Structure formats: structure tokens, C-alpha cells
Design a protein with these regions (language model features):
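Sec-dependent N-terminal signal peptides
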Residues: 4-13
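Aromatic-lined carbohydrate-binding surfaces of glycoside hydrolases
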Residues: 20, 31, 35-78, 135, ...
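Glycan-recognition surfaces
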Residues: 22-34, 59-74, 155-169, 212-313
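Carbohydrate-binding surfaces of carbohydrate-active enzymes
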Residues: 43, 72-76, 296, 300-396
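Autoprocessing Asn-cyclization modules and mimics
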Residues: 49, 53-133, 137-140
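Intrinsically disordered, low-complexity segments enriched in serine, threonine, and glycine
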Residues: 92-94, 118, 133-145, 382-496
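Short conserved beta-strand and strand-loop elements enriched in small hydrophobics
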Residues: 103-111, 149, 409, 463-467
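Chitinase-like catalytic core of GlcNAc-active glycosidases
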Residues: 151-180, 198-206, 214-216
Length: 496
């Protein structure tokens, strides 16, 4: 039987002073951000403000009927043939500017903007089709052969980028706004876009210098480390969003990233984790998912960004539990309480861990979280294969339409029944201590259930049978899934 249980004493040690504090990403609305701030302070996290100071909405790019002279452009390219004012297909000579993906596909010829829909490359010619002439209020015009053609820089948000002169003005304005806030951390994603012009890395440094000038004492974070930016940045977060489906892929790359930033002497953040509500695409974030991520942050001794909106905080039934768990893991990480052996164990991409406080020490033990088992309502039987023997927790979800009642789960070691009705859009949550609750799909408690009987699982394979009564709605059966959780042995509490 695999056993790994640890007792960790919380030791305050000065050698860990360089550990980076994690943070919650602030909402744009001030009222919501203030709500987040209160929650973040309770658990010892910073509140970070994401700053995008070089985005120009398309509706703001015009100077009368002419494009602004301060838009960032690539080129020039040149027209292969003359073009009249109604022509919607035309050709330009080859240029590497078309190697960059674009979200809007805007070209500028003199004072006319043209949006092309498709492009085909033949030899040294780019053929542009289904073009909108006189786009965004500009005037359609005829253009001569070899007329210069420019491609405007755009972003995935369908915004345009400024030239260096306008970027400096925008940076100064945004820096002054940030200086009036009390956010301790300013976050710059897509930092490379500040250096797309001819100035390159120097433009990035100039931008960060402006932000620092008006925000002394605040930490600056970006998603990219460059020679010029290193002087200004307090930490780097490459903005990788973690989720359960990417377990192995993400963890495999972390050691290389950690080594790279260590050689640069730059504190490194492990990425971002989103706590979200249930929707038609995803189930609400669980405690087990969060602790899996927290164990990886502990494994690499790295802080992280937490995408936990005020709306989600207000509606998620486990908000206080999730924040309290973050506080425990982060206290231990920040104070260097995890041993190297524990960190190596945490790096297992499939490993799940749970932490609880016990007086002045903390108990950490491994968990096994099963896949979801679909029910077919014909005395469903499965072989559950758990690395740990003993009690187990259950998560039974009902979705779609209809309901189930008279739930019963039988193992060779006993039977547990749940005298309740579980409707579509609800969970039955059964925990290790025998407590059971009906919740909504965001884990808000609706009704307590008194479970009857007891059962345990073997180490290794156990045959399990689940049965219930099914109530259709408009002839449609509900969709029911089960997931079980087991845990390793507790360690004896350290008497010191």
C-alpha cells in the first residue's frame, strides 16, 4: 500500500523571505475589486491589477475621416497593379508581414482602410479577396501601381496598437491612474506587444520605466523576461492557465522554466488557476482540483495568480473553504515548511493531496480521486480500484431532467443508503466523516441527508453496486454520475 503522510510544523524562517506572494486577479469594477480585496486580505494574498496600456479600440482609431497617424504599421508592401475605387480583389508583392496572424486584417493605402477576408499566396504575390473598401468610415479611392500598402498591427481582442509616440502618451496616462490605486501588484500581459515597433526591447523598457516612475513601491509583473525588462520586474508569470485536462503537459515543462528563471535571478510564478461556477461546458471548481494545483505550486516553490471573480466568490458554495485551504498551503510554502522529499512527491501530475491544520502542526495526506462513473439504472456495478483502503467520500451528480431517490451503494464490506430525492441540477456530497448534503451544482448546501449504514473499500479492487429509483421528466431520464475519493493513512500528530 502506498503511504505518504507528512506532519509539517509551521516555522518562520528568514531564509524564505524571497518567496513570492500569490495574488488574486482584480475585477474591473471597483465595488467588486473592493470585495475581492477583503477576501484576499483574510488569506494573505495580494490583489493584482491587470494593465493593458497599448490597446486602441477600432472606433477610437480615426481622426475625422482619416486613420490616425499614430497607429503601428508594418510595411510598406506595394500594389502589383493599379486599383480602382470599387475593386474588391487585388494583389501585392510578397512580404513577411503576412506571416503574422491577424484578427482584423486591416490594410492602409494612403488614407483608405481596406479589410480583406481571405488571402492566397502564389510565388512572390499575395492575392487578397473579398475586400471591404473604405472600411471604418474612410473614403474609397483609386490607387496607382506600386502604391505603398501598410498592414496595421492588431491584437486578439480586435484592437489596434499605437506607434511609439502614442504608446508613451497612453503609458503615462495609465501609469497615473494606477498610481492613484492601492493595488500592490501591477500585471502586464502580452509585454512583447510594447516592443513591436522599431525600438524593440528599448520601447518595452521605456514603458516599464514610465509605469515604475508613477508607481513607486509597487511590484511589477510581466509574462515575458527580456534583457531590458529585467531591471523593472519583481517577478514573471507566463500566464499559463492550469486545468485538470492539462495535468501532465504542464508539469513536464515546469522544471525547465524553474531552472531558467533561477539562472536569471528572477522570481517565477507558476501560472494562473481559475475558480469558476458551473455552466453548460464545465462543472464548478472543486476543493480537490484546487488542492491538486496548490500542491504543484508548493512543489516548485512558486506563487501563482488566482482568477476568482467577485461574482464567483459570492455564488460558489465552497468559497470560504477554498480560501481557507489556499491560506494553509500558502503559509507553509511561504515559510519553507515543505521538505525536498515532499516537494518531489507533490510533482507527480496525477497526485492529489489534502491538508488540514491540527493545533500547531499540519497534516498532509494523499488522496485518490476517481474518474466519473455514469449510471445506467440497471443495478450499476463497477470494479473500483483504489490505492487506499478504508472509508471513502462520494460525489453524486444529477443533470439534465428528472430525479433519483432511494440511493444505495453496496460493497462487500457494507451498504450505505441515502433516504432522499436528488433532482437534476443537484449533487449529493458524502464525506469521510459520514456527513451528507444535497447541494446545487455550485456546492451551495440545500438539505442535510442522514446517511444510513456504513461501507469501506479494499486496497486495490472492490466490486461496488449502485441502485436507485428513477423519475423521468417528460419521458427523459436524468444523467447521473458518481465519483469516489479515498485517502491515505493519517500520521500521528507531532507532540511538539
Amino acid at each position: 500500500m502506498r503511504k505518504f503522510v507528512a506532519i509539517v510544523l509551521l516555522l518562520l524562517c528568514g531564509s524564505c523571505a524571497l518567496a513570492q506572494r500569490s495574488y488574486i486577479l482584480a475585477d474591473g469594477d471597483k465595488k467588486d475589486a473592493d470585495y475581492q480585496k477583503g477576501k484576499s486580505q483574510q488569506v494573505g494574498l495580494d490583489l493584482g491589477l491587470t494593465v493593458l496600456a497599448n490597446r486602441i479600440p477600432i472606433e477610437n482609431m480615426m481622426a475625422g475621416s482619416k486613420p490616425s497617424k499614430h497607429l503601428l504599421r508594418e510595411g510598406p508592401l506595394h500594389l502589383q497593379l493599379p486599383m480602382d475605387d470599387n475593386q474588391t480583389d487585388f494583389a501585392v508583392y510578397h512580404s513577411e508581414v503576412f506571416d503574422r496572424k491577424s484578427s482584423i486584417n486591416i490594410l492602409q493605402i494612403d488614407n483608405e482602410l481596406i479589410v480583406y477576408r481571405t488571402m492566397e499566396t502564389t510565388g512572390n504575390i499575395h492575392l487578397l479577396y473579398q475586400c471591404t473598401r473604405g472600411a471604418y468610415g474612410t473614403k474609397k479611392s483609386a490607387h496607382a501601381k506600386n502604391a505603398p500598402v501598410y498592414r496595421l498591427w492588431d491584437t486578439p481582442e480586435r484592437c489596434l496598437l499605437p506607434d511609439l509616440e502614442l504608446q508613451d502618451q497612453m503609458a503615462k496616462s495609465e501609469a497615473k491612474k494606477c498610481g492613484k490605486t492601492d493595488y500592490p501588484l501591477l500585471i502586464f500581459n502580452d509585454l512583447k506587444s510594447y516592443g513591436y515597433g522599431e525600438q524593440g526591447d528599448e520601447a518595452i523598457a521605456h514603458f516599464l520605466d514610465t509605469m515604475q516612475k508613477y508607481n513607486p513601491g509597487k511590484r511589477l509583473q510581466a509574462d515575458l523576461l527580456t534583457p531590458a525588462s529585467q531591471t523593472y520586474l519583481s517577478q514573471v508569470n507566463e500566464n499559463q492557465l492550469w486545468n485538470e485536462s492539462m495535468r501532465t503537459k504542464i508539469v513536464e515543462t515546469l522544471s525547465e522554466q524553474q531552472d531558467y528563471y533561477r539562472t536569471k535571478g528572477m522570481p517565477w510564478m507558476i501560472g494562473n488557476f481559475q475558480i469558476h461556477l458551473a455552466d453548460k461546458y464545465r462543472k464548478a471548481t472543486t476543493l480537490e482540483e484546487l488542492e491538486w494545483f496548490l500542491s504543484k505550486a508548493a512543489a516548485f516553490d512558486a506563487g501563482f495568480g488566482l482568477d476568482f471573480s467577485a461574482a464567483t466568490m459570492r455564488q460558489h458554495g465552497l468559497t470560504d473553504t477554498l480560501l481557507g485551504t489556499i491560506k494553509l498551503w500558502e503559509q507553509l510554502r511561504m515559510n519553507g515548511a515543505f521538505s525536498e522529499e515532499q516537494k518531489e512527491a507533490f510533482k507527480d501530475p496525477y497526485g492529489n493531496w489534502h491538508i488540514e491544520q491540527a493545533d500547531s502542526s499540519y497534516l498532509i495526506y494523499p488522496q485518490y480521486v476517481s474518474r466519473r462513473y455514469p449510471c445506467h439504472f440497471e443495478d450499476d456495478s463497477w470494479i473500483w480500484d483504489s490505492p487506499y483502503a478504508g472509508p471513502f467520500a462520494l460525489r453524486i451528480a444529477v443533470e439534465g431532467k428528472g430525479s433519483i431517490s432511494g440511493l444505495s451503494l453496496r460493497t462487500p464490506n457494507g451498504t450505505i443508503t441515502f433516504p432522499c430525492t436528488l433532482k437534476a441540477g443537484q449533487y449529493l456530497i458524502y464525506d469521510f466523516d459520514g456527513s451528507a448534503w444535497i447541494t446545487d451544482l455550485n456546492f451551495n448546501k440545500l438539505e442535510e441527508v442522514i446517511a444510513q449504514g456504513a461501507a469501506v473499500l479494499n486496497e486495490g479492487e472492490t466490486e461496488v453496486t449502485f441502485s436507485c429509483e428513477v423519475q423521468k421528466e417528460k419521458g427523459v431520464l436524468p444523467r447521473v454520475t458518481l465519483r469516489y475519493i479515498t485517502k491515505g493513512d493519517w500520521a500521528e500528530k507531532n507532540p511538539h
